[in-house]
Amino acid sequence: PHLLFLGDIKNPLDAKTAMGVLEWRPEHCIGQFRLPGCEIDLGLPDLSPAAALEAGARSLLIGVAPLGGEIAPEWMESIRLSLASGLSIVSGLHQRLTAVSGLKSIADAKQLALIDVRVAPDIHQVATGRKRTGKRLLTVGTDCCVGKKYTALAVCKALAKQGVDVTFRATGQTGIMISGSGIPVDAVVSDFVPGVCEYLTPDAGENHWDIIEGQGSLFHPAYAAVTLGLLHGSQPDL
């Protein structure tokens, strides 16, 4: 179970990781940890790391997804406090916990884990464009944060309820935290994004559906490259 860290954020869009995990895995969420000035409330109990540990939490999950994916300096005291209190740290940010000076030594001394979710696998696979068996659906949108992940999860849940052979394929950090597997495609070297998407959605049975979490938008000047790589690599039927 997690203590969801919200820092001092004011924009609800910045809390999309915490909101996503709470929506789809509420049983994994013990409480929220907010700093002064935070204007986001998930409706969970406000807990200190020590109180969360006592309530059953085993990790502090950084529930914030700021532009650029950096750990704000003002969060570091809370992260260190969480480690000192006995909580492992889970992060979906680009900046790795293991690269932050001093964190690993604290975690090692307490026998705790620093879990960086947004790390690309060591897969240097160039896309072939070969048509694969099985069926695929890729969620797309006109912007970031418009519901591509939620839609993919909802479609997957509905199909599974009807007995369809279906798999949710996470391509972002929050989707991976929710489903327990996937590849954070925005951490992959650009040459290999389509190939990694082929790897993520391999040959499957004739009636099997892969529901693929979309990223960004073709209209977005910053993230369209990831979107296009997903489109080429997933070869969606829908």
Q: Where do the model's predicted regions map?
A:
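Walker A (P-loop) phosphate-binding motif
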Residues: 124-168
